[in-house]
Amino acid sequence: MAEKKRYSKRYCKYTEAKIEFIDYKDVEMLKHSLSERYKIMPRRLTGNSKRWQERVEVAIKRARHMALIPYIIDRKKVVENPFKI
């Protein structure tokens, strides 16, 4: 039987930094919760608390709707920075 992966304990960076609001226009801050294909990363990888993970998801979805962040990128078209295409 395959062993489960053990993830290291991560702490919510938003709680530690005492941030009160996540702005959807701050793309640099939102990139920490996105994978290289711009998919939203789960809580177990980012270490966000439930409260902040929900707020990050809403901010990312708003930024996608406003075309500040791309939706999902194809495997063939993965580049380092899609904003400079």
Swiss-Prot record:
Statement: the UniProt record of this protein carries the keyword Flavoprotein: no
Cited Pfam families: Ribosomal_S18 (PF01084)
Keywords on record: Ribonucleoprotein, Ribosomal protein, RNA-binding, rRNA-binding
Any one of the GO CC terms: cytosolic small ribosomal subunit
Matching InterPro entries: Ribosomal_bS18, Ribosomal_bS18_CS, Ribosomal_bS18_sf
PROSITE patterns: RIBOSOMAL_S18
Molecular functions (GO terms): small ribosomal subunit rRNA binding; structural constituent of ribosome
Biological processes, Gene Ontology terms: translation
Oligomer and partners: Part of the 30S ribosomal subunit. Forms a tight heterodimer with protein bS6.
Protein family membership: Belongs to the bacterial ribosomal protein bS18 family.
HAMAP family: Ribosomal_bS18
PANTHER family: 30S RIBOSOMAL PROTEIN S18, SMALL RIBOSOMAL SUBUNIT PROTEIN BS18M
Job of this protein: Binds as a heterodimer with protein bS6 to the central domain of the 16S rRNA, where it helps stabilize the platform of the 30S subunit.
Protein name, per record: Small ribosomal subunit protein bS18
